[in-house]
C-alpha cells in the first residue's frame, strides 16, 4: 500500500482514482499528476514502481496544496473574512449560509436543529 501525502492509497484501484483519496486532489488534478509523471490511465497502484511512487509524491509536494496544509489555508481564509467584518465573514460568524441561499425555510444543515419558540402553538 503506497503512502502519499500522509494518506494510504488503495493498491487495487487505478492510479487516477486512488489519488482522489487525497484531500485536495480531484479528477482533473489526478489526471494532471499522471500526465506529468507519464503514467498511463489504466495502470493500477499495485503495478507502480517505488521510483514512480516517489515521483508522484514529489510532484504533489511541489505543485499542489493538499491535506492539512489545504485545510489550514481554508481556515485562515475564513478567519480573515470574519476579522474583516465583511458580509461573508458575518455569515460565517453567525453560522448561516454564505452564498446567498434562502434561510426563511431550509438551511437546516447550516443553522442546526430547529429551536422551539415558547408560546407558539398551532
From Swiss-Prot:
<comment type="subunit">
    <text>Part of the 30S ribosomal subunit. Forms a loose heterodimer with protein S19. Forms two bridges to the 50S subunit in the 70S ribosome.</text>
</comment>
<dbReference type="Pfam" id="PF00416">
    <property type="entry name" value="Ribosomal_S13"/>
</dbReference>
<dbReference type="InterPro" id="IPR027437">
    <property type="entry name" value="Rbsml_uS13_C"/>
</dbReference>
<dbReference type="GO" id="GO:0015935">
    <property type="term" value="C:small ribosomal subunit"/>
</dbReference>
<keyword id="KW-0694">RNA-binding</keyword>
<keyword id="KW-0687">Ribonucleoprotein</keyword>
<dbReference type="InterPro" id="IPR010979">
    <property type="entry name" value="Ribosomal_uS13-like_H2TH"/>
</dbReference>
<keyword id="KW-0699">rRNA-binding</keyword>
<protein>
    <recommendedName>
        <fullName>Small ribosomal subunit protein uS13</fullName>
    </recommendedName>
</protein>
<comment type="similarity">
    <text>Belongs to the universal ribosomal protein uS13 family.</text>
</comment>
<dbReference type="GO" id="GO:0005829">
    <property type="term" value="C:cytosol"/>
</dbReference>
<dbReference type="GO" id="GO:0019843">
    <property type="term" value="F:rRNA binding"/>
</dbReference>
<feature type="region of interest" description="Disordered">
    <location>
        <begin position="95"/>
        <end position="122"/>
    </location>
</feature>
<keyword id="KW-0820">tRNA-binding</keyword>
<dbReference type="GO" id="GO:0000049">
    <property type="term" value="F:tRNA binding"/>
</dbReference>
<dbReference type="InterPro" id="IPR019980">
    <property type="entry name" value="Ribosomal_uS13_bac-type"/>
</dbReference>
<keyword id="KW-0689">Ribosomal protein</keyword>
<dbReference type="InterPro" id="IPR001892">
    <property type="entry name" value="Ribosomal_uS13"/>
</dbReference>
<comment type="function">
    <text>Located at the top of the head of the 30S subunit, it contacts several helices of the 16S rRNA. In the 70S ribosome it contacts the 23S rRNA (bridge B1a) and protein L5 of the 50S subunit (bridge B1b), connecting the 2 subunits; these bridges are implicated in subunit movement. Contacts the tRNAs in the A and P-sites.</text>
</comment>
<dbReference type="GO" id="GO:0006412">
    <property type="term" value="P:translation"/>
</dbReference>
<dbReference type="GO" id="GO:0003735">
    <property type="term" value="F:structural constituent of ribosome"/>
</dbReference>
